[in-house]
Amino acid sequence: MADSITTIVTALGFPSIESFIGVLLLGGAIIGAIVVIATIRPILDLFPFAYPNARVRARIGRLLNEKQLSEILETESMEEFKNYLRGLPDYAKYIDRFPIEKALESQLAETYEMVSQIAPASIRDPFRANLKRWDVRNIKSLITAKAAGLSAEETVNLLVPGGEVYEIIEGLADASSVQEVVTGLEATEYAGVLEDALSGYEETGMLLPIEAALDRKFLEGLIRTVGSPSDDNTKILHTYFGTMVDISNLKIILRAKADGLSYDDISPYIVPHGYQIREWKLKDLMESEDVSGVVSGLEGTDYGQMLSEALSEYTSTGSVAVFERVLEDNLNRMARNFALKKPFGVGPMIGFLSRKEVEVKNLKVIARSKREPGFPEAMVKEMLA
């Protein structure tokens, strides 16, 4: 028997049984290693998200529930509204420091900063790029204030601590003109787009060229930072931020068509790097005759049906805000779905930021109702997201 085994082993090219056994053991070890790696790899991929998502879930637990929102809605004055928020850890430290809208948005900016700091290294860059929304928001507020002739104190009250160049922007609160603001920002990454758009403002007296140029720079930078999707998490980011671009483009086109503007009027403000709507489709939409043409041109996309369902309300009200609300609701649903679809990855972070945005938006609506006596309660409830 032993001789037969030796003969077989020799026929296979092995000099001895010992060498054959050694090869078998080595092969088993390699197979075992492959199995271990295949088993551990998913766990290793999830590990960087464990701490960030634990932090995020703790914050999700502090979001306002329906009962709390109803109680806030039932407050009878601005002071009572503020008193309620003083009892909430997330808002308490801001309520007595800033005017109410600035207080609410300051908490939102802090939330964005927190998420960007704890995001795993593999996806941190897009979250850092997303913080620049506060630079753009503050520059818009600054130039609006200067165009309106507001004082330095009034201007500062419009600025939210956040972004990368807040100190520079705040330092320009006493600027006397939009042109002086543009000059004061020449050392920032926004200098080029502001200088290019300034002539449009000087020719028309409208801030739209500057505001749209800032939006375009922000969105293009965000998409560029996400880059090409390489795994499930970056695919989600690419889809989500790409959808943000789609929605921004659609808002611009719908408003432009409601105002009777042409392709040449619209095209400088469009970002050609969205998720579903390609450049050729954007061109077709910009060349549409009217709002109805834009909606019908979206047939075959996710946006087509939802905007078609809102078309009758637009026809009766004449306000494109109905479309904007539908588009924003769609983005919020997408964020919630990602939180469920990728609960151990980037999903909870996107879902949380979206829900926080909605919370702050709702609080700003309620704050407005407390500030303006006689604001209809039915209108408030209709405006809540």
Curated annotation (Swiss-Prot):
Membrane topology: Peripheral membrane protein
Subcellular location: Cell membrane
Cellular compartments per GO CC: plasma membrane; proton-transporting V-type ATPase, V0 domain
GO terms classed as biological process: proton motive force-driven plasma membrane ATP synthesis
Keywords, comma-separated and alphabetical: ATP synthesis, Cell membrane, Hydrogen ion transport, Ion transport, Membrane, Transport
A GO MF term: proton-transporting ATPase activity, rotational mechanism
Record InterPro entries: ATPase_csu/dsu_sf, ATPase_V0-cplx_csu, ATPase_V0-cplx_csu/dsu, V-ATPase_V0D/AC39_subunit, V-type_ATPase_csu/dsu, V-type_ATPase_csu/dsu_dom_3
Main location: membrane
Keyword Amino-acid biosynthesis carried by entry: no
Disulfide bridge positions per record: none
Family, as annotated: Belongs to the V-ATPase V0D/AC39 subunit family.
Subunit-level organization: Has multiple subunits with at least A(3), B(3), C, D, E, F, H, I and proteolipid K(x).
Function: Component of the A-type ATP synthase that produces ATP from ADP in the presence of a proton gradient across the membrane.
Protein's name according to its UniProt entry: A-type ATP synthase subunit C
Gene of this entry: atpC
